[in-house]
């Protein structure tokens, strides 16, 4: 999801005990020696200079597909991915971290680093009930609890910020400190009867105090951090604080959130196109990213949560006006509409991402949440129009400018499948289930199986360089997130779907029957 520099201001489940794994899905995996390895083949290097022919990018080209014959096909693929991820595991006295490139700083983030991999192991444990997977999750969480401040070290902060081209992301909730906090919250809720739960709770609350007492700056109406409203930046920090408040309770924290919300509202701008715009790309940039990670879709989502926890109608009204802006910039397709990746510049209105970061897999979460708070048919209409627009571009089977040769959770099919499974949980529509399953066919079809039985996914990380493929392990950018989606599809096919969700994920945990 690498983007140009925005110029933003830079700042330095299922509950079970540690001794008893859940058997909700009755697929206890006892011997993971069959699905893990200690080496990785030479072909699994981080960067690949030449794309396999079936994953080379051509607009309109079909993605490789493989249709699952039964639910176990999804589980086996996820377990093969775990085997590959495990080859990058590093044990320390304080726990486990995962790292592909030893020449780079240790990546602790939810997005692409160890916190995201630990989150995958949480999900793998919930589904399989395997005690060794649970131990890996606990050890990964323990390392994150001990080392989250490492993300603030100059070398690590620069690594995160420069890789994404956005100063300040090391403070945010995806690539920074807040994302580690979100995973620690999930760990505390999952291992509720374990002595480790208290460790994770304390670390998550320490991250909360870092945001409230150390890194916050004072604006005209309240505190802020980076000065960008993007969910990747201040918006995501606020989502973490809301999750922290709702999980552990703290009236003083709620008052802080209210003050930060007042400051956040100051960043709204009346758009000449209509509605209200929150431009996370920065007010000095000549362009605007309107979707979930950086734009008004993500800001509207945060405002909906602020309305939900405070009852302050100002947030609901501005969220509605964010939707007005998105409606104003949406571009009609042969069917439905799509919101462009970017407003302004030579490619304005021409590229339509379909993933989480700048596309429907993320943006659909905004009308979904609003539909639970605001009794207006417009939210269901928005969901259907965006889904129609995606299919009009040939998704999920065909490549396009905004769905290039990528399948990861951030930009591709793993994120789309997750969102459409969430929509299926709301209304049980066969359409949503079928769309998710079609995405699953592509995840299986694009999987690269190695001689040792492990599996990875070669895909292009950067849209502007589709010839450069990599095989990554992270949650948003690699195998951990893809494998997590495969676990969801496994549960769906077994008619036993259950998925505890983070705060950026507004869908029900279970399908409504």
Feature map (PLM): residue ranges:
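Short polybasic linear motifs
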Residues: 21
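Glycan-recognition and catalytic cores of secretory/periplasmic carbohydrate-active enzymes
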Residues: 2-4, 9-11, 16, 24-513
């Amino acid at each position: 999801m690498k983007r140009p520099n925005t110029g933003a201001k830079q700042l330095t489940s299922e509950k079970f005990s540690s001794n008893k794994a859940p058997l909700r899905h009755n697929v206890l995996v006892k011997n993971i020696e069959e699905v893990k390895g200690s080496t990785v083949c030479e072909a699994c290097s981080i960067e690949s200079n030449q794309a396999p022919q079936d994953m080379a990018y051509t607009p309109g080209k079909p993605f490789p597909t493989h249709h699952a014959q039964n639910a176990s096909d999804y589980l086996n693929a996820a377990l093969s991915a775990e085997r590959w991820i495990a080859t990058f595991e590093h044990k320390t006295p304080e726990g486990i971290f995962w790292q592909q490139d030893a020449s780079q700083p240790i990546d602790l983030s939810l997005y692409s680093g160890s916190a995201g991999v630990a989150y995958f192991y949480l999900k793998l444990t919930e589904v399989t009930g395997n005690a060794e997977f649970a131990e890996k999750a606990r050890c990964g969480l323990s390392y994150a609890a001990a080392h989250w401040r490492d993300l603030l070290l100059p070398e690590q902060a620069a690594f995160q910020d420069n890789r994404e081209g956005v100063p300040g992301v090391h403070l945010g909730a995806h690539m920074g400190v807040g994302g580690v906090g979100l995973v620690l919250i999930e760990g505390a809720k999952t291992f509720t009867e374990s002595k480790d739960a208290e460790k994770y709770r304390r670390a998550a609350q320490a991250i909360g105090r870092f945001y409230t007492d150390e890194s916050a700056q004072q604006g005209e109406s309240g505190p802020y951090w980076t000065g960008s409203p993007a969910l990747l930046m201040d918006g995501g920090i606020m989502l973490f604080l809301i999750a922290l408040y709702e999980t552990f309770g703290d009236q003083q924290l709620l008052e802080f959130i209210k003050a930060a919300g007042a400051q956040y509202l100051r960043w709204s701008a009346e758009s000449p196109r209509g509605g209200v715009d929150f431009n996370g790309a920065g007010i000095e940039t000549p362009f605007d990213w309107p979707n979930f990670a950086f734009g008004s879709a993500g800001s509207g989502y945060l405002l909906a949560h602020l309305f939900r926890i405070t009852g302050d109608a100002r947030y609901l009204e501005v969220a509605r006006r964010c939707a007005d802006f998105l409606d104003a910039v949406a571009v009609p397709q042969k069917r439905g509409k799509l919101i462009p990746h970017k407003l302004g510049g030579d490619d304005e209105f021409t590229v339509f991402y379909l993933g989480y970061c700048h596309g429907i897999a993320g943006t659909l979460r905004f009308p979904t949440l609003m539909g639970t708070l605001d009794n207006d048919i417009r939210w269901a209409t928005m969901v259907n129009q965006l889904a129609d627009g995606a299919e009009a571009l040939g998704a999920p089977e065909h490549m396009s400018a905004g769905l290039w040769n990528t399948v990861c959770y951030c930009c591709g099919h793993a994120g789309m499948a997750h969102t459409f499974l969430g929509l299926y949980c709301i209304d049980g529509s066969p359409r949503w289930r079928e769309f998710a399953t079609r995405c699953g066919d592509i995840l299986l079809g694009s999987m690269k199986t190695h001689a040792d039985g492990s599996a990875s996914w070669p895909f292009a990380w950067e849209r502007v360089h589709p010839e450069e493929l990599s095989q990554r392990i992270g949650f948003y950018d690699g195998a951990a997130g893809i494998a997590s989606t495969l676990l969801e599809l496994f549960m769906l096919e077994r008619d036993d779907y259950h998925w505890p969700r983070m705060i950026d994920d507004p869908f029900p945990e279970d399908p409504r029957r």
